[in-house]
Structure formats: C-alpha cells, structure tokens
C-alpha cells in the first residue's frame, strides 16, 4: 500500500534506538527525507552509516535553549514523530525531584517545544501536516513503580487532544500511538524474567508483546493521508490490554 510519504520531510526524535530508529528507516524506505534527532552522537553516526541521506541532529531535548538553537533552523517539516522518552522506575513513596524534572522535561515539555517549532513552520508555509506522539498503555493504566512515567504519558495523551483541537483549523493532524511492552533490545532485556513477563502477558488478550514493526506501521499510517480524517486519537497497539 502506497502511503504517499515520498518527497515529504519528516523529523523523528529519539531516533538513535528502538522505535525511533526503526521509524527513521521505514520513513526513508517510503521515500521521505528524514531529520533524525538524538542526544547520543554514536547512535546518530551509526544510523547515518546504515541509512545514508538521513540528516542527524544531536541535542538533549531536556535542554530547552539547546533544543531551540538546534531545531529553529531545521527547515521545512511536513511530518513529526515525537518519540524521545525516558523512564525512571521508582515506588511512589521514593519518587525524587530529579526523576520528575527529567521525565517531564523529556516526555512532555520537549513534545510541546518541538511541536511548536514544527507547527509554526507548517502554518507559516500554509501546508497541512501530521504529528504523532509516541505514548504508552501506561497513560491509561496504573503500573507499579511507574508513578512518573504513567503521569507523563497521561499528560501526553491530553496534550495530543489539545494540539489536535488547536492545530486542526490549520490542517495539522495530531494523534498518539499507545503501545504495550515493545520488543526492542531494551524491552527484551527488561522483560526477560518469565514470571515478570507472565504477569503482563496474562493481561493481554493476544498473549504477546508488540514487535517494533507493529508500532512503526501504526505511526506511518497516522502520518499518511490514509488516516486523513483521524486526529486527536490515542491508538492502542497493545494486543487488547486496554480492553481488559
């Protein structure tokens, strides 16, 4: 199926690893020009070697001023994937100021800032656009030791709706994708314990975790004109977890 992404310019945050990296590869394979944003230079260097033509931008999105400087002259962007995120797991009674500050700066505030930069450019050019925010099933279900992470993703889901409301008149669609556990290298490592995995898998009707391509396919669909009437949604990629 042709998604009509050829010739469009996309920006992906958290592009060095996992879902972000795979999204960059898929977008370029679909004919898009891609700006890849990561805080880790080594990841960007290896991405450019694997995927020549990608435009790398190395910046820590937790730093507002550095992000403004790095992205203010990034050029026209038609498609945005806000994927960068951090997860600090702590019991509620042990949550620290540092965990709150870092998590909200990256998982929420950076989405606001990057989306503002990109959306202002779209509006100035008078062109339609699409934004996908990578959220989580944790936005809608409480998970032990995930106080801050769940809260940032809940905030991200509501941000998605407000962005859709305010940017819709400018023909800019905004949606979230909400995966379950995803089998990235980090996901495999974190859920390798059979007992821990079984507790979660027992809550998923399809009985399995998501593969990276399940999430990437959904992101590309939401970026494409195939979803031209979809905005303000939070689309689960969770095997039915949120239905239970």
From Swiss-Prot:
Superkingdom, taxonomy of origin: Eukaryota
Modified residues (Omega-N-methylarginine): 21
Top EC class for this record: oxidoreductase
Database matches in InterPro entries: L-xylulose/Carbonyl_redctase, NAD(P)-bd_dom_sf, Sc_DH/Rdtase_CS, SDR_fam
N-acetylmethionine found at: 1
Keywords: Acetylation, Carbohydrate metabolism, Glucose metabolism, Membrane, Methylation, NADP, Oxidoreductase, Phosphoprotein, Xylose metabolism
SUPFAM superfamilies linked: NAD(P)-binding Rossmann-fold domains
Name by which UniProt lists this protein: L-xylulose reductase
Chain's gene name: Dcxr
């Amino acid at each position: 199926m042709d998604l009509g992404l050829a010739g469009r310019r996309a920006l992906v945050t958290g592009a060095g690893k996992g879902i972000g990296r795979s999204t960059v590869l898929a977008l370029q394979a679909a004919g898009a020009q891609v700006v890849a944003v990561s805080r880790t230079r080594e990841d960007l260097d290896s991405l450019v070697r694997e995927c020549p033509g990608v435009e790398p931008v190395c910046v820590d999105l937790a730093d507002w001023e550095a992000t403004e400087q790095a992205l203010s002259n990034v050029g026209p962007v038609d498609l945005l994937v806000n994927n960068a995120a951090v997860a600090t797991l702590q019991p509620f009674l042990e949550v620290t100021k540092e965990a709150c500050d870092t998590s909200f700066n990256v998982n929420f505030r950076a989405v606001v800032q990057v989306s503002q930069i990109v959306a202002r450019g779209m509006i100035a050019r008078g062109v339609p656009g699409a934004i996908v925010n990578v959220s989580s099933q944790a936005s809608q279900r409480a998970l032990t030791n995930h106080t801050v992470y769940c809260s940032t993703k809940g905030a991200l889901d509501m941000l998605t709706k407000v962005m859709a409301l305010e940017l819709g008149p400018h023909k800019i669609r905004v949606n979230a994708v909400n995966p379950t556990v995803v089998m990235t290298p980090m996901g495999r490592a974190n859920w390798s314990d059979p007992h821990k995995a079984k507790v979660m898998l027992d809550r998923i009707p399809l009985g399995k975790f998501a593969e990276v391509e399940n999430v990437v396919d959904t992101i590309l669909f939401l970026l494409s004109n195939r979803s031209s009437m979809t905005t303000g949604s939070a689309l689960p990629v969770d095997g039915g977890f949120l239905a239970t």
